[in-house]
Structures are given as C-alpha cells and as structure tokens.
C-alpha cells in the first residue's frame, strides 16, 4: 500500500474504455479495492486490518466524493465495520477512536458521528450487563437471556446483536438455541 501522507504526491491509475479515459488518483483506486476486501472478508481480525488500511485513505476519498456531489455515500466500509468489529471484541476505546477518526475525516453526515458514539455507549452498557449475567449463570440459554434482561436494557435488539456477533462470549449449540459462556 502506498503512503498518501503527502497530498502533492498522488499517483494516478488509468481506467476506461475505447471512448473515455479517466485518471483516478491511486488513493481512490486503493480505497475501492479495500472496500471489496472489507466486504468479502469473513475473519474479524483481517477485516479490521483492511478497515485500518482504508481509514488512512478515507480523507482523500471523502474529499473526492464531496467534490463530485454534496453528499456522503450511504456505504463507507471502514466507517461501517471498523467500530462495530471493535465493539464485538469489547474494545470500547478503540471503537470510540475509530468513530472519532471517521468523524474527523467527515465520513458522517452532521450529528451521525454523535449518534455512533451513543450507539457505542448503549452497546457497551448492554454488553456489560449481559457479560455480568452470563458469568454468574454460565450456560444460560440464549433464547432465555432476552426475556431475563429485557427490563434492564434500553433496546433488546442491541442484546440480540451482542449475542450474535460478540467474541466476548462462547456459544454451545443446545437444541434450537445456544448455551452462553463468557470467553476466556
């Protein structure tokens, strides 16, 4: 991956067909390639690695997008995946830093960065309650924890996301649900 810290050094890629040729800054070309890698990668750590690579290119891409139109595209892979992957791993400070870096690059619509920080705080709150309960009741059934914790959390959907994606818990299949344990 090239170093794009010098804004005056932006190598270009040539793309096009027989009728039109476009010169695309190499940073944008690399950004698009990383988007595909982020979206297709299944392993959390590798996906997160690609997110950090793309985060370095995000300011160039956002500037380019805003020069074309007045909006930020709805899908920005590193912005959409980076914080969530850290959340699923329980890395709250890293998730917060990732959100702040995306916000600094103007990758959010106004106030959406603040909304992401609130979502992070809500997810952390739910995760801490769920982890506490699971550690006191190892093997609790996934289907039961939703009912048990329903009155203690702001949004049941956050708990469902936590139990589905979190690497902080281990799931053992049991009948048509899972037994939940805190990961070591």
What residue spans do the PLM features occupy?
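Short capping segments at the starts of secondary-structure elements
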Residues: 135-144
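Charged low-complexity interaction tracts in eukaryotic proteins
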Residues: 125-126, 157-184
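Short helix-coil junctions and helix-kink-helix linkers
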Residues: 144-156
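TPR/TPR-like alpha-solenoid helical repeat scaffolds
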Residues: 66-82, 110-128
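Boundary/linker segments of alpha-helical solenoid repeat arrays
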Residues: 62-63, 104-116, 157-158
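Amphipathic alpha-helical repeat scaffolds of TPR domains
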Residues: 15-42, 49-59, 72-85, 128
């Amino acid at each position: 991956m090239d170093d794009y810290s010098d804004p005056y050094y932006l190598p270009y890629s040539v793309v096009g067909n027989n009728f039109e040729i476009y010169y695309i800054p190499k940073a944008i070309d690399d950004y698009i390639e990383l988007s595909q890698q982020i979206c297709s990668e299944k392993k959390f750590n590798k996906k997160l690695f690609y997110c950090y690579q793309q985060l370095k290119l995000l300011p160039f891409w956002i500037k380019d997008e805003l020069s074309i139109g007045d909006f930020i595209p709805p899908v920005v892979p590193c912005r959409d995946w980076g914080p969530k992957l850290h959340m699923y791993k329980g890395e709250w400070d890293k998730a917060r830093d990732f959100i702040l870096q995306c916000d600094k690059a103007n990758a959010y619509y106004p106030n959406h960065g603040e909304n992401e920080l609130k979502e992070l705080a809500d997810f952390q709150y739910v995760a801490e309650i769920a982890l506490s309960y699971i550690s006191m009741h190892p093997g609790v059934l996934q289907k039961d924890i939703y009912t048990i914790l329903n009155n203690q959390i702001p949004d049941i959907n956050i708990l469902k996301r936590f139990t589905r994606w979190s690497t902080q818990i281990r799931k053992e299949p049991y009948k048509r649900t899972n037994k939940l344990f805190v990961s070591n």
